[in-house]
Amino acid sequence: MVLLKEPVQPLPRSSLLYNNASNSSSRIKETRKVKLLYNPLTKRQILNNFEILATLGNGQYGKVKLARDLGTGALVAIKILNRFEKRSGYSLQLKVENPRVNQEIEVMKRCHHENVVELYEILNDPESTKVYLVLEYCSRGPVKWCPENKMEIKAVGPSILTFQQSRKVVLDVVSGLEYLHSQGITHRDIKPSNLLISSNGTVKISDFGVAMSTATGSTNIQSSHEQLLKSRALGTPAFFAPELCSTEKEYSCSSAIDIWSLGVTIYCLLFGKLPFNANSGLELFDSIINKPLEFPSYEEMLNGATSGITMEEYTDAKDLLKKLLQKDPDKRIKLADIKVHPFMCHYGKSDAASVLTNLETFHELKVSPPSSCKRVELVSLPVNSSFASLDSVYMENFDHNNLRTGADRNSTYSPSIYDANTLSPSAYHNIGSRESSYSSFSSFTSSTAFASQISIQDAPAIGDQQCLIGESGSSLRVNSCEFPQYTTMSPVGEYPFESTEASLSSTLTPVGNVPQRIKAHLVEGKSNSKDDLRIEADASLVFEASDAQRTRRRMSLYKL
């Protein structure tokens, strides 16, 4: 059980609550060079000085990884942001900077408060397509208010939290919001999943991907007008304020937006369901704008985790929510008034001297200690490879036996029962039937890159003239089962492969004298694709056998 902190008291103006942006940003390390390595023994990637341990979450604007600082042993969270936007109709050569990346960085640079997740370091290599934010790690994870087996959008209550547990969460969030608003920052996406709990029970506001700033003095922060034009499409619709849902009148980007989403959050924590819900976006917006606020009855509340609440406490909770979820933003309650509201100050019979959280609700992720394995040579990976990137599905499932040099593979191969004309060494065979990806076309002819990243799987006999066709995003993947061919997909045309045959031969070191013939042709992509066109290559190499079936293996390479 984890002890939640006592209610947060208002801080003096000289405290962290009123730290200015310059003091906060000076604490943050900025690194302009990114190096990505792979440890074949631990099967883990290493980003600069951080060993990647696990995936913490996948958001709309980036994936978050758990990592260990190899210098200090401290655990951190690393958020991975795409430097460039994906836009329909653009080729790989035309890249558009993602404005939200700089926006999030500039906002987080201004923040240093105990109830806001802290930014430690920015890994921003101009040559990388990713930007990495090294953040404070909150081991208890996000605040949960409905059972694990229930989708939040379909939750009907009751909440798995008590009123007192919810009150403790809200006090910390109010403290964090008060700080953000004092810095001219509107979070724009306050919701339970963006409220993280540290190991000591402190609740911290996280995820500033859609945050807005009215602060001056930074040229990287978009103007208020630009932010307003984009804000209606960003965030979580179920937590949108009415002024975000209506297009009939203009609105200003104000702290009232966060007050409303805080009200929706408190409603979820107390009653275990969303205050406004619908089957479609338009219905949801209409409900938020026009539907009156409703509450479960006191009798219903007594059947859930809140069975110990008093009628007075229940009445105070409803009164606070009515003031938070006020349709008119000008009439919404202020943060200072929330802290002194009777519900926040009330202590009923459900309270105790110390409030313990439910381990099922706020469990702490267990992380194994650093490995004490012997020294191993790390494999250097290209930083822009879709295969090697930290948010790649290939790398997350990658088999470390796949990372071997040509010499290693040859030394471990013993012909034994295999025919000399059949490619069957165990080091080659069936590495999860996964494709390998590369950062540039030149890597197809690079012996080191190719030797360390290959995927080989059984293919039908040559007599079977069928084709295997599958989709991969915006590309049409063609793995022909005809005689050996090399297929390339490109928005610009065919590539010459005169030198490829020699490079492949020397790199793969096939068993026996096997003729290898490679040809290339262009395959058209899907015309209605909304994603960027992608270059894809599939090489099928035939290794003839002496048996009647003419057994063969297929090797596939992909640049995604």
Curated annotation (Swiss-Prot):
PROSITE patterns per the UniProt record, alphabetical: PROTEIN_KINASE_ATP, PROTEIN_KINASE_DOM, PROTEIN_KINASE_ST
GO cellular component: cytoplasm; peroxisome
Gene Ontology molecular-function annotations: ATP binding; protein kinase activity; protein serine kinase activity; protein serine/threonine kinase activity
Pfam family membership, one: Pkinase
EC number: 2.7.11.1
Modifications after synthesis and translation: Autophosphorylated.
Taxonomy, superkingdom: Eukaryota
Active site per database record: 189 (proton acceptor)
Residue span, Protein kinase domain: 50-344
Keywords carried by this UniProt record: ATP-binding, Kinase, Nucleotide-binding, Phosphoprotein, Serine/threonine-protein kinase, Stress response, Transferase
Gene3D superfamilies: Transferase(Phosphotransferase) domain 1 (1.10.510.10)
Catalysed conversion reaction: L-seryl-[protein] + ATP = O-phospho-L-seryl-[protein] + ADP + H(+); L-threonyl-[protein] + ATP = O-phospho-L-threonyl-[protein] + ADP + H(+)
InterPro entries hit by this protein: Aur-like (IPR030616), Kinase-like_dom_sf (IPR011009), Prot_kinase_dom (IPR000719), Protein_kinase_ATP_BS (IPR017441), Ser/Thr_kinase_AS (IPR008271)
GO BP term, example: signal transduction
Binding-site residues for ATP, renumbered to this chain: 56-64, 79
Functional note: One of the three SNF1 protein kinases (with SAK1 and ELM1) which are required for growth on nonfermentable carbon sources and nonpreferred sugars and for response to environmental stress. Activates SNF1 by phosphorylation of its activation-loop 'Thr-210'. Required for the regulation by SNF1 of the transcription of a large set of genes, the modification the activity of metabolic enzymes, and the control of various nutrient-responsive cellular developmental processes. Also phosphorylates GAL83, MIG1 and SIP2.
Protein family per UniProt: Belongs to the protein kinase superfamily. Ser/Thr protein kinase family.
Entry's free-text remark on domains: The C-terminus (residues 351 to 560) is required for efficient SNF1 pathway signaling.
Entry-linked PANTHER family: SERINE/THREONINE-PROTEIN KINASE IAL-RELATED
Name of the protein this chain belongs to: Serine/threonine-protein kinase TOS3
Source organism: Saccharomyces cerevisiae (strain ATCC 204508 / S288c)
Gene responsible for this protein: TOS3
